[in-house]
Regions:
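Conserved donor-binding/catalytic core segment of Leloir-type glycosyltransferases
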Residues: 25-54
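Nucleotide-activated donor-binding/catalytic signature segment of Leloir-type glycosyltransferases, i.e.
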Residues: 78-99
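Short alpha-helical donor nucleotide-sugar binding micro-motif in glycosyltransferases
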Residues: 98-99, 106-111
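Short hydrophobic beta-strand element within catalytic cores of glycosyltransferases
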Residues: 134, 138-142
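Donor nucleotide-sugar binding/catalytic pocket of nucleotide-sugar-dependent glycosyltransferases
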Residues: 1-18
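Conserved acidic donor-binding segment of nucleotide-sugar-dependent glycosyltransferases
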Residues: 153-155, 159-166, 175-181
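A short, well-ordered alpha-helix in the C-terminal region of glycosyltransferases
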Residues: 168, 175, 182-197, 206-209, ...
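Acidic donor-binding loop of glycosyltransferase active sites
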Residues: 109-124, 137
């Protein structure tokens, strides 16, 4: 029996309050993508930067329609910073290495799409997906042999691409940038999926049910 993680109760309460107060907004000038995590190889951040660069290089009209926030630190930090400078995307891709929990919540609120481009099975679940989804954000993730593509489902709560598929990731970024209806629909579905499967209450209930079954010798 698999018991998935539950989203932190404080984060869920914050998301509930924010969504309740959120009013309809006019069309944004640009779509904000967000990555949260350690800047290490298996997270696939370099792939994300390459996909972003490839997309705006082939379709320059999209450059002013999208931005990317990278929240986190790690051993690849210097290399990733240099890549962004070399591609001239310093005004579209932004690094945030020291972020408080309160600031992280604001990043979740302000982003339009969350991206988890992990390329190795080391990414077993991707709890950050759930944290973004509870704020009604669609997810772009990768088809790893782990829990990652199970959390956010392709075509329902977001888009799933093959690990290390730069072109596929670029096309997913494009789709989410130009298709507002898709973002809205998948964002709503993402929120609903977390409420149904990934609350702390759900996790505790499944844990209780499992122990009860074991005690009974099931």
């Amino acid at each position: 029996m698999i018991i998935p993680y539950g989203v932190d109760g404080h984060i869920k309460k914050t998301a509930d309050d924010w969504l309740a107060k959120e009013k309809k907004k006019s069309e944004k000038e640009c779509v904000r993508f967000l990555f949260v995590g350690r800047l290490v190889y298996y997270k696939g951040v370099k792939n994300l930067l390459e996909a972003y660069s490839e997309l705006v290089s082939k379709e320059p009209d999209l450059k002013e329609k999208m931005t990317l926030d990278i929240v986190g630190s790690g051993p690849l930090e210097k290399e990733l910073h240099e890549y962004v400078r070399e591609t001239g995307l310093q005004d579209r891709i932004f690094f945030h290495t020291k972020v408080t929990d309160a600031q992280l919540v604001e990043f979740y609120k302000k982003c339009d799409v969350f991206v988890l481009p992990s390329q190795r099975r080391s990414e077993a679940f991707g709890l950050v997906q759930i944290e973004a989804m509870i704020f009604g954000k669609p997810v772009i993730n990768t088809n790893l042999p782990s829990g990652v593509p199970y959390v956010s489902q392709d075509g329902v709560t977001g888009l799933t691409v093959e690990p290390s598929d730069i072109e596929g990731l670029a096309q997913a970024l494009k789709k989410m940038t130009i298709d507002k209806d898709c973002r809205t629909r998948m964002g709503k579905a993402a929120r609903q999926r977390v409420e149904k499967e990934y609350t702390m209450e759900k996790m505790l209930q499944k844990t209780y049910d499992l122990y009860e079954k074991l005690v009974r010798g099931g």
